[in-house]
């Protein structure tokens, strides 16, 4: 399992949730889902519900099994292979293995599908079907979606099977920033807690819950990161750049503040790439070039002055880079670094032309 989810420790345990959420996010990216609900139930059981189309239940010719059964039992069966015709142009789930790996890492898993006016259910134990897919009732016309409920296997996750609310919240908040307008709700139903109200009084006991939805997308993300760190911004509006080719889409939001630190977060198909990669390289090279070229052409840098370095121009910068690609190439199974060479060119060209244009139009910045 470590090959697919990174570890069988705490990180891998939480990765199971992200894999199922990524499937729902793929429905959102395709335009079919706008609400994803994640619950931590008693005994650290996880439930993820989306209002997407619902995983198909029709029998597949090559296996003789319902599509949903195949998705949860066969590696690489997800609809994520082959761009245009796979059902998804871009997808964040781990190489299409997500659902079946989560199933294999669970003591039990139940999937409920609502589509075509009916609700279907199937349960699995340690990855194998525990009975066939059944129709368990009807739903109102137009009601669709998928609900996955699973209990991580304690024989596999020997360190811990206890979920941490804050860890899940951080990741799900990232997902909501990266997918503008998608609402993600996280609720902890393991125990009640007593909230402290604004006037200092205690409120009624309730489950801890966070609702995350950002119409501003990654611009809101940059604002959030600055406010969280109580930073003094040097220009009021976040700069937003977007570029697109037939290979993918790149979005960048950036803002400078009075600190000396650089904070750069990058994502490819909604997956954080902490080790950077070609999207970061393209951005950094172009940002430095823009500052030097603009500085020289406007007399801010004199002939005798040395060029500004990359470290100089990224001082006090908060930046979020998000690229969405049909075929993302990650280095290492845990996707820490992006390898697509064509994205370096896309990001580099976009940053240079659009940022140069921005500075010409906003010399005050």
Predicted features and spans:
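Conserved ATP-binding N-box helix of the HATPase_c
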Residues: 10-35, 98-105
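GHKL/Histidine-kinase-like ATPase module
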Residues: 132, 166, 174, 181, ...
């Amino acid at each position: 399992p470590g090959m697919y989810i990174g570890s069988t420790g705490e990180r891998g345990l939480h990765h199971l949730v992200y894999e199922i959420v990524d499937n729902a996010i793929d429905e959102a990216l395709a335009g079919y889902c706008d609400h994803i609900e994640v619950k931590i139930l008693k005994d650290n059981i996880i439930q993820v519900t989306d209002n997407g189309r619902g995983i198909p239940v029709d029998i597949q010719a090559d296996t003789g099994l319902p599509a949903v059964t195949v998705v949860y039992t066969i590696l690489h069966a997800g609809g994520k292979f082959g761009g245009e015709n796979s059902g998804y142009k871009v997808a964040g789930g781990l190489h299409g293995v997500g659902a079946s790996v989560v199933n294999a890492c669970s003591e039990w898993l139940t999937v409920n599908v609502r589509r075509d006016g009916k609700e279907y259910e199937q349960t699995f134990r340690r990855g194998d079907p525990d009975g066939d897919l059944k129709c368990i009732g009807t739903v109102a016309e137009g009601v669709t979606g998928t609900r996955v409920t699973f209990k991580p296997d304690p024989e596999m996750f020997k360190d811990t099977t206890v979920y941490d609310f804050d860890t899940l919240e951080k990741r799900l908040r990232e997902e909501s920033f990266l997918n503008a307008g998608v609402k993600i709700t996280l609720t902890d139903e393991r125990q009640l807690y007593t909230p402290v109200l604004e006037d200092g009084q205690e409120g009624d006991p309730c489950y801890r819950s966070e609702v995350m939805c950002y119409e501003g997308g990654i611009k809101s993300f940059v604002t959030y990161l600055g406010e969280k760190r109580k930073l003094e911004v040097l220009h009021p509006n976040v700069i937003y750049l977007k570029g697109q080719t037939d290979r993918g889409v790149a979005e960048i939001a950036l803002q400078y503040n009075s600190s000396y630190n650089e904070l750069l977060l990058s994502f490819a198909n909604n997956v954080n790439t902490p080790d950077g990669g070609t999207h970061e390289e393209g951005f950094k090279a172009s940002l430095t070039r823009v500052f030097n070229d603009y500085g020289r052409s406007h007399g801010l840098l004199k002939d005798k002055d040395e060029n500004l370095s990359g470290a100089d121009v990224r001082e006090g910068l908060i930046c979020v880079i998000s690229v969405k690609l049909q075929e993302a190439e990650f280095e290492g199974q845990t996707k820490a670094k992006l390898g697509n060479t064509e994205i370096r060119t896309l990001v580099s060209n976009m940053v240079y032309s659009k940022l140069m244009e921005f500075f010409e139009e906003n010399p005050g910045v």
